[in-house]
C-alpha cells in the first residue's frame, strides 16, 4: 500500500513539475530600441511613419507572426523573413492623421513561440492644416 501511495505521489509531483513550463516573454527574445514614439504635432491629412527597431537577443531565429493595431488609423507592417540571432529587424508603423485630435495608439506584436504580445505605443497630436483652417474661416 505504501508503494502504491509513493508511486501515485511521485506521479502527481512529476506531472505538476512538467506542467509548469517556463513561459518565454518577448523581452527575453527581442530588445526594442524604443517602445514608444511621439510624433509631436502633425498636420491633418499628412500620414506619418515610424520604424520600431529591435534586436534578436536569443540564440534562435525570431519570427514575427503578426503585427496589429488598436484602430484602423494605424497600420503596422512586420518583417516577412525570420530575424537571426544578433540581427536587427524593423516594425513599420504608419498613422493616417485623418482626425484633428491628440492620439495614443497601441501596436501589438506577436512573436512565434512567445505567448504574450509585445505592445508598442505611438502618440502625437493632429492639428488642422493651414489650408483647412483658411477654408473654414472664409465660410
Name what the model sees in each region.
Residues 96-101, 112:
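Short, surface-exposed loop/turn segments at beta-strand-coil junctions that are enriched for proline
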Residues 54-58:
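Asparagine-centered strand-capping/turn motif at beta-strand->loop junctions
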Residues 1-23:
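Bacterial Sec-dependent N-terminal signal peptides
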Residues 20-46, 53, 115-139:
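Long, low-complexity ectodomains and other extracytoplasmic segments of secretory-pathway proteins
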Residues 37, 87-93:
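Short strand-edge motifs at loop-to-beta-strand transitions and within beta-strands
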Residues 109-115:
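Short, exposed beta-strand-loop hairpins at the edges of beta-sheets
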Residues 59-85:
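Surface-exposed binding patches on compact interaction domains or structured appendages
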Amino acid at each position: 500500500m505504501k508503494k502504491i501511495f509513493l508511486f501515485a505521489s511521485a506521479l502527481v509531483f512529476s506531472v505538476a513539475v512538467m506542467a509548469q513550463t517556463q513561459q518565454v516573454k518577448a523581452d527575453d527574445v527581442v530588445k526594442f530600441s524604443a517602445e514608444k514614439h511621439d510624433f509631436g504635432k502633425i498636420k491633418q491629412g499628412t500620414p506619418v511613419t515610424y520604424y520600431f527597431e529591435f534586436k534578436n537577443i536569443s540564440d534562435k531565429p525570431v519570427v514575427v507572426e503578426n503585427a496589429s493595431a488598436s484602430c484602423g488609423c494605424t497600420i503596422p507592417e512586420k518583417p516577412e523573413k525570420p530575424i537571426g540571432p544578433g540581427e536587427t529587424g524593423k516594425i513599420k508603423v504608419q498613422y493616417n492623421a485623418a482626425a484633428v485630435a491628440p492620439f495614443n495608439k497601441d501596436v501589438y506584436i506577436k512573436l512565434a513561440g512567445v505567448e504574450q504580445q509585445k505592445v508598442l505605443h505611438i502618440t502625437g497630436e493632429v492639428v488642422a492644416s493651414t489650408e483647412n483652417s483658411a477654408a473654414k474661416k472664409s465660410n
